[in-house]
Amino acid sequence: MWAPPSAGSNAAAIAAAFPQARVLKAFNHFGAEVMASPNGADACVAGDDAAAKAVVLALAKDMGFTPRDAGPLRNAAVLENLAVLWIHLATQSGMGRQFYFAFKTP
């Protein structure tokens, strides 16, 4: 079973190793099939650098995703765990690789 690194997430470990880098977590909670044809799928982006996050959120929108600001980089741990759940559902629960998580409001 996957366990997060001592830094809390892989993204946090990268940020700690490269303190001058503008590290974001994005595009990790769906498969390549959704990347190829997003059709409005939600794409969460977590990071501490507002300017870098704005670029990635705009990129997600331009690609056809519904961009979602997932907050600071510490939330990368949540996104990494969401990816673990996606992998399980895709490979062990019969959902296949062409699904994505959607965040809806009533």
Language-model-derived ranges and their functions:
Residues 1-33, 52:
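Rossmann-fold NAD(P)-binding glycine/threonine-rich loop
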Residues 34, 41-106:
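Active-site-lining helix/loop region of Rossmann-like oxidoreductase modules
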Residues 1-2, 39-43:
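Short, flexible active-site loops
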